[in-house]
């Protein structure tokens, strides 16, 4: 694969606030690359620099061989953005929203009509083409935003938390469409706080916290390296931790306390689970390790506001 985006020692500052703190990464053409992190981690600031709507404070950022400076129209024409906010004109129909947006890319009207019809079919909104925006569900609005992002046939698609607030059915439909775009050769850049979404869609991810990259890699590899394959959750009083760790620690590759729960991480859970059965502890859960475990281990389990 060819590298399509390269960041080297990238900074973004807003006055005295450092939102992006010297990060470096590469995104390969045709992959889905995810930025994960809690609120304020620097995900959106990074995305805005890639999309040339926010200037780079320091460092270098190259997109498709060009510097990503503010208002680089050449790069903007190669990029489609699915925003987190619903930015559709409520006075227009679904079809009219797409037709109006096509003018920003100087798409000839005849070509735009054909393209709009294709995209409404792609996002399963043909039957809603003449509906006003307020007549659409939230899931339909988000699918229309996907269609809008594809009008200019972009090489790079930025999806900024594309399924926020959606029910599971709508979320899975959007995942299907994003996977289809990737199969067609698009490079996807995803920001999300849904760990399952990142596992479903991303070839590689970075986990950001306080403007820095903590880890980078394939979701499955990060889970194996940071957590193992299985997790035991034991809801038990903290004053019993020492005794329990003494009995179970040899079977685990790590442990931590969070709130009312003691977590044990292991690569082979059979021995740990046999011991737990012997101890017959109440309030115990044994499950596969997930990307959420990695995320919480690296960024902390305390509430971040």
Regions found by a protein language model. Name each.
Residues 1-11, 301-305:
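ABC-family P-loop ATPase nucleotide-binding domain
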Residues 4-5, 12-209, 215:
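ABC transporter nucleotide-binding domains
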Residues 76, 120, 223, 273, ...:
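Conserved protein kinase catalytic domain
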Residues 80, 106, 145, 223-228, ...:
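A generic structural signal for secondary-structure junctions
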Residues 175-267:
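ABC transporter nucleotide-binding domain
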Residues 266-305:
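C-terminal coupling/interaction segments
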């Amino acid at each position: 694969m060819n590298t399509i985006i390269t960041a080297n020692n990238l900074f973004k500052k807003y006055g005295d606030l450092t939102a992006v703190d010297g990060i470096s990464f590469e995104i390969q053409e045709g992959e889905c690359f995810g930025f994960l992190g809690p609120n304020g981690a620097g995900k959106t600031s990074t995305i805005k620099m890639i999309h040339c709507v926010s200037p780079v404070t320091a460092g270098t950022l190259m997109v498709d061989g060009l510097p990503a400076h503010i208002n680089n129209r050449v790069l903007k024409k190669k990029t489609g953005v699915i925003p987190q906010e619903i930015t559709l004109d409520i006075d227009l129909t679904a079809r009219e929203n797409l037709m109006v947006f096509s003018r920003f890319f100087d798409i000839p009207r005849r070509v735009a009509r054909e393209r709009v019809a294709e995209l409404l079919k792609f996002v399963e909104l043909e039957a809603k083409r003449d509906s006003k925006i307020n007549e659409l569900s939230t899931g339909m609005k988000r699918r229309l935003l996907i269609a809008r992002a594809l009008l200019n046939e972009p090489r790079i698609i930025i999806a900024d938390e594309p399924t926020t607030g959606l029910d599971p059915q709508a979320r899975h439909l959007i995942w299907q469409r994003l996977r289809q775009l990737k199969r067609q050769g698009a490079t996807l850049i995803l920001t999300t706080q849904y760990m399952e979404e990142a596992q479903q869609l991303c070839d590689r991810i970075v986990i950001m916290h306080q403007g820095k990259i903590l880890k980078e890699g394939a979701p499955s590899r990060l889970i194996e390296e940071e957590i193992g394959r299985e997790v035991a959750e034991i809801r038990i009083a903290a004053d019993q931790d020492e005794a329990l760790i003494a009995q179970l620690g040899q079977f685990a590759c790590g442990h931590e306390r969070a709130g009312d729960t003691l977590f044990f991480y292991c690569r082979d859970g059979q021995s740990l689970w046999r011991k737990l059965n012997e101890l017959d502890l109440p309030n115990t859960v044994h499950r596969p390790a997930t990307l959420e475990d990695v995320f919480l281990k690296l960024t902390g389990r305390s509430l971040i506001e």
